[in-house]
Regions:
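Hydrophobic transmembrane alpha-helices
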Residues: 2-63
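Membrane-embedded alpha-helical hairpins and interfacial helices in multi-pass inner-membrane proteins
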Residues: 29-48, 71-191
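Central hydrophobic cores of alpha-helical transmembrane segments
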Residues: 62-72
């Protein structure tokens, strides 16, 4: 967890936060007009990015997801619920890189690529788990504030997040991983 704070000492990681936030916000904003629960969540195919950027860029991907979601909220859903969205989206990017290595034994190849069936299954499992954690946090916060019932919001956000990651995640990982690695931008190479 320390890397979440120490990453700010690395210029490349700070740039990756800005890049990730910009890409996430720029792809979230156009779907603001497709609400599922008006004022709280909408159809979000862009939710693929926290999983992919979290796994590739580590803590920079997590911070980028949080900031990108907050920027998106300025375009129609900004309010006290945005605090829950900030934290929930942080975890959407944080959990993929934190959980990835826990699925592999010592000495096993833990490169964040989907080059084996096991890695694909692990990626898909992480997408579902991170989606649920994000949804629980956001739904709990909004229920605490009295905005939306927990069960309804948690179910919608979990499915919405997971669908984007399950369908688009493997495609983006296969396309981006080789390039990110070649450019030396994997978080494990920077920090």
């Amino acid at each position: 967890m320390r890397e979440v704070f120490t990453m700010w000492r690395h210029t490349q990681m700070v740039v990756l936060v800005a890049l990730t936030a910009a890409i996430y916000a720029a792809t979230l904003i156009p779907t603001q007009f497709l609400p599922i629960i008006p004022g709280f969540t909408n159809v979000r195919p862009a939710n693929v990015f926290p999983f992919v950027f979290g796994l590739l860029f580590g803590p920079a991907g997590a911070w980028g997801a949080a900031v990108g979601n907050l920027i998106n909220d300025f375009f129609g859903t900004l309010g006290l619920g945005s605090i829950g969205g900030f934290v929930g989206n942080f975890f959407l990017g944080f959990l993929p890189y934190k959980m990835w290595s826990s699925f592999f034994r010592r000495g096993e190849d833990i490169e964040p690529n989907l080059a084996s069936r096991k890695k694909l299954v692990v990626f898909l499992a992480i997408v579902v788990l991170a989606s649920a954690v994000c949804a629980v946090w956001i739904a709990w916060w909004n229920d605490l504030l009295g905005f939306v019932p927990f069960a309804a919001l948690a179910a919608v956000i979990t499915v919405n997040n997971a669908l984007a990651g399950l369908v688009l995640g493997p495609i983006f990982m296969v396309l981006l991983y080789p390039r990110i690695r070649r450019w030396g931008l994997l978080w494990t190479e920077i920090m």
